Amino acid sequence: MMTIISLLLLASLLPHLTFTAHVNVGIVNGREAKPHSRPYMVSIQWNGTHICSGFLISDEAVLTAAHCWNRNQTLTVVVGAHDLRESKNSDHIGVKCYIQHPSYNVHFHFNDIMLLKLQEKVKINNYVKWIPLPKNEEDVDANTLCSVAGWGQLKTEGPMSDRLMEANVHIMNRSECHERWGRTFSEKQMMCTYGHGGSCRFDSGGPLVCNDTAIGVTAFGDNLHCNSPEKPNVYIKISPYIPWIKRTFRNVK
């Protein structure tokens, strides 16, 4: 009975997780990541189900997408995981504070970034580490080789992956991305990628990684086709938010 109730509750919240025509974006046309090669990756879960990715930026802080949290939810962060079916090397940690960007706009995707302060500090080891962030206003050139990872769907309307998947992507020219997405796209806040592989549903909140630095947060893509060449995946640029991230964690107890 409880399983049925949980599934019904999850179904009722899915519209919030895919809040517009451009849904939140597992990895398509990718490969299984080498176990624990991305120790900063976390699975964000609700009632034991993976709903988003995130990444450690300190021993007590996770960065993810703002749309990954509905205010009625109590989320759990799983660190140190590769296969979500296995508990070895992983740890489940509660969230103490949910801090969506104050200017987050659910309808237009703007400022779709959120900090999670954990209830306890993670234990740093070979399976759990944080990833560096860019400097203020630091940008990445078009065509730069980067990568994405997650436990989301393996194809459009397909199953989610139990094991962490990854794919290489390239940074798209900003003007081209703006042309594809129109007013939905903000050149100041966002960036796009292109490539054979890419993000899909339930990869939201994971990092776009370039040169071992997290430079973006997976935000949205085409709801009809994962990793669509016509509507490329969009990421929130982290560099403009560095002052907010630092200021927020100075003020959070």
Protein language model annotation of sequence segments:
Residues S37-P39, N72-T74, S90-I93, N111-I113, ...:
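Extracytoplasmic
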